[in-house]
Amino acid sequence: MEISESAERKAWDQWIFLILTMESITELNNKTQGQLLGGNDLALFQSILLTAFSDWIPVIEAVKLLFIELKDRKKQMKYSEKNCLYCYYVPLTTPEVSTIFAGYGINLIGNTAFLSYRAERYPQQSLSDKIASMCMQILISNDHAAEAQEVCKRLKEYRCRGYLTGMFSNDRWIGGNQKDIARLIEKESGYPVFFLEMDFWDSNNL
């Protein structure tokens, strides 16, 4: 099946707009230390990036509306400092995690799994080039030092009490690196890292 250049361009523009709007929502929530979206709300919202849709227009419109509503809510809320942890990935499939922390007055914000950073730029002639460039900028697909450095920046920027990671002991690709990165974060930032030894997909071992 051939896809026209105009269709490719339209799809790319829609995707970029969605990504930028979602990043704006996440940053807004992070700056309020999770007082706009709870950990489970954040996880559900970010699951859009893991979902396939036949038509992105309704999704984009819903995300745009959410951004407007959250900005309005922020204007009306009385701000106060909250205890929060920056999280590798708030586990959407085990909502008990966020609920337990919330019960102790700790908000979960983040997530590192969706962060990107500035990588070396290459010529982007086609849609495939653009997608490849985007993949190269995914933080968790790069080296440990880069991931730890970016996390440290956010711990300071959002005035977090520490970093919450783990939850992927069942995954050799993701889980195998987490303890090394956790040590780097503690060494570089001085922030405590809390490590949950559990299965991201299964709450039975909480």
Go through each PLM region and give its residues.
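A charged, amphipathic alpha-helical module
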Residues: 1-120
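Short, flexible active-site loops
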Residues: 81-84, 130-138
